[in-house]
Every structure is written in C-alpha cells, then in structure tokens.
Amino acid sequence: MAGTALVTGLAGFTGHYVARELEALGYEVVGLGQGGALDGRHLSVDLRDARRLGELVAEIQPQVVVHLAAVAFVAHGDVSDIYSSNIVGTRNLLAALAACKRRAEKVLLASSANVYGNAEVPVLDESCAVQPENDYAVSKCAMELLSRHWRDDLPIVVSRPFNYTGVGQSLSFLLPKLVDHFARRLPQVELGNIDVYRDFSDVRTVADAYARLLGAGESGEVYNVCSGVSYSIQDILLMLAELAGYSIDVHVNPAFVRANEVKRLAGSNRKLAATIGELKHIPLRDTLQWMYRAQTGQ
C-alpha cells in the first residue's frame, strides 16, 4: 500500500477524478472539505475552522496531499468567501500539515492560470509575470505567495491549471452549459463574452498530471497544466453542432459579460512534460463527445 493521500475538495468535480488516479497507484484516499460523506472516506470540515482542521489532519497523518478545496468559479458573487476560502483555508491547511509528526512527502496546491491575467504573449509559460485581473485570480496568487512561508517545512508544488472540463462539472461553467443546451436541443443560448480563447484540457488529463506530480514534481516549483492549444467559443460551438446535428442561436447577454475578462489563455506544458513525462492527451472534441453522450445516453 502506498499510504494515505489527503484530497481536500474530494466531493467536488475534480476530486472524484484525482481520487481515482491515486487509488490506482495504491493510495488510501481520505477527503476533507464541506459536503456529505463519500463512501465513508470524506470528513466534513470547513477549512477556515483552523482548530477542527488541525485535529483531523493530525489524525490522518497523510503521506501526500492534493489541495483542491476552493471557490473555483471566477464569477462567484461573494468576494469575502473567495478570499477566506482560497487564502485562509489554504493557510490553515499548511499550518496543520507542518504540525504533523510525520512530514508529508509532497503537497500539491492547485492554483490557476488566471494568475497570468491578460499577459501579452502568445503562449504562457511559468516564467511569465503574474498580473491577476479579478478577485479569484488575486486570491490564487496570494495563495501561492503564502505557501512560501512553509517551503522549509513542507515539500510544496504548485499547479496552474488552465481551463478544463468533463462529465460532472457544474453548469455554471461554459462548456457544461453549452453541452447541456445541445443535449436538450434548445434553440438558443445566452452567453457573455464570446470573443475569447481558452486552452481546454480534459479533467482526466489534469487528474493524471496531479497524481504524477506527487511523485515527480520538484518542491518549490510551479507547473502549468494545459493542452498547449487554445480554442475560441465559436470553435466549440461548431464541434457541438457537429455532434448534435444542429446549430444553436447565440445571444450575448450583457449581464453575463465579465469585467476584466481575460481575452486569451494559451499555455505551455513543456515544463510539466519534462517533469512527469508524456501527457495523457485527450482531444477537446473527444471530451465534448464524452460529455454529450453522458447526458443524452447515446
């Protein structure tokens, strides 16, 4: 048995896929975060409750940690919740881990490519300056900075995932929303900014990368997790139209247009691939087909 893997946010979208990868490696997975029990392996706690969190982490004594618990939606309306969850919650977790009798072998913190903001470079690598454009990105940038306080006590690696999607993601995110509209064969969809480009990965690729970073990731390093290819919203609409056999009318709703929208996010995964080996590449069309079929039963 490889030992115990602690996954915060296990009950969330990404947590399920990460747990599957870790279990395949022989880890016993234990989850921490808000939400109900999952097969008896999920312990409910608000990471902002430092005392209770510390007690649970001391009981678990994890060998490896994947920290996913966070407010993950850029347009989340409660600013105080964004900062308290993403910064204070992370700080409490790191303090609890540092106090453990047995030092964790690796701690992976999931940040976000949104920290790069509107960088004026065609492809973003880890050397690019961070210039966050919204509260969510600022909170993730701050999380990265505060993690440096524990660099002598904990072997921390930071991932900066670009956009990713898959079966089970909330309809508040763009691609699940679009898939849902096409699967229900709705005639039109309301969107915000459509003149944007995003680097999309499959959640299964991201989960695989996270699991491998626990073994190969170098402490103190930051790694982009991305496909290296960006798509426009129009590209995605065309893929879904082909899958569903019809085109949908797009209406731009000003209420959905975000201030300080990042126009283009395209990442370089060279550092990641050099560290963990060849990535588990899944074409975006295949991901959309997987999501579409999961909803339609086809």
Language model region names:
Residues 121-122, 145-199, 203-212, 237-241:
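NAD(P)-dependent short-chain dehydrogenase/reductase
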Residues 135-142:
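Active-site helix of classical SDR
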Residues 91-135:
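Conserved Rossmann-fold NAD(P)-dependent oxidoreductase catalytic core, especially the SDR/UDP-sugar
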